[in-house]
Amino acid sequence: MLYHVFYCLSSIFTPFNIFQYITFRAGGAILTSLLICFVAGPCIIEKLENFKIKQIVRTDGPETHLSKNGTPTMGGLLILLSVVASTFLWARLDNRFILWLLTGTLWLGFLGFCDDYLKLKKRDSNGLSAKSKIFGQTVFAAVLAAYLNFFPSNPEFATLVNVPFLKGFFINFSFLYALFVIIVIVGSSNAVNLTDGLDGLAIGNITIVAFSLTLFAYFAGHFQIANYLKIINVSGAGEISIFLFAVVGSSLGFLWYNSHPAEIFMGDTGSLFLGGVLGMVSLFIKQELVLVLLGGVFVIEALSVLIQIFYYRRTGKKVFKMSPLHHHYEMLGLSEMKVTVRFWIAGVILAILSFASLKVR
């Protein structure tokens, strides 16, 4: 919004030219979202406590988690509010990627809100059924897939997927690309949701992935840089950096309250939309497989659940003491904070490897 207000006045007051620069507006976005979280955080935590919107902890989980029972949840509302407000202020609202990301934020955020609401209403740790959540995610992903098919940002690469570390090598999904889009969005949304089981674990890794994708988006949107790095140039993708920096600021602000011992949990209200928008960004900038590496912590967490379910149904035995994977390490005796920090470190290492893929080919 600020771009549309001030940049058009730059002919009258030259300093307003600064609003044309993505780097300036991205800086404004991260500071705004961070400030909103810091200021609104205590108020939202208090309101959630007053309305008794509190976490229902699974009784079959680690015993150390029983103390978390009663911690305010639905904190994803704080993240969503700060991301949307900051993006609305600093991004160009005529950019189609921004409009889609805001739509995805609200759609998946509402889906997560419904899940959290049902958990509170039933006083149970189970809200929406898995089928209902996947259906809601799939509907949105299918609409986006249709849009990307009929209005691709770069028709030449519309159904191609870049393979990291291999120069100029692409996989052509052809008519299966729509299915690929659905898998990316549904998969990333649920992977983050499954990772959100320890204080600060999911939001810390979201910060790492979102910050890294910010740079990838900026590179993809800059013709000279994209050409130098031999990645697909996507017109308008640089604006995505502003949205992602809003996510980074919100994540850091939320981590202030979500770090161990957590004062608030994001719930599905936060995790579903955060995972979903990361998947959307990877599709927009044509770095879908880089997200698999960059978000490797989320991928491994999701795979641990799938492996556990599949193996248990086939043999009646468990591969892990408990899934997702972070609970397995807790059951082995590692402290919650140690598991969280080690997963953060793994996230940083994966981010470094992801950036290495830009040059090591």
Swiss-Prot record:
It catalyses: UDP-N-acetyl-alpha-D-muramoyl-L-alanyl-gamma-D-glutamyl-meso-2,6-diaminopimeloyl-D-alanyl-D-alanine + di-trans,octa-cis-undecaprenyl phosphate = di-trans,octa-cis-undecaprenyl diphospho-N-acetyl-alpha-D-muramoyl-L-alanyl-D-glutamyl-meso-2,6-diaminopimeloyl-D-alanyl-D-alanine + UMP. Pathway: Cell wall biogenesis; peptidoglycan biosynthesis. It comes from the Bacteria. It is an enzyme of class 2 (transferase). The keyword Protease does not apply. GO terms for biological process: cell division; cell wall organization; peptidoglycan biosynthetic process; regulation of cell shape. This is Phospho-N-acetylmuramoyl-pentapeptide-transferase.
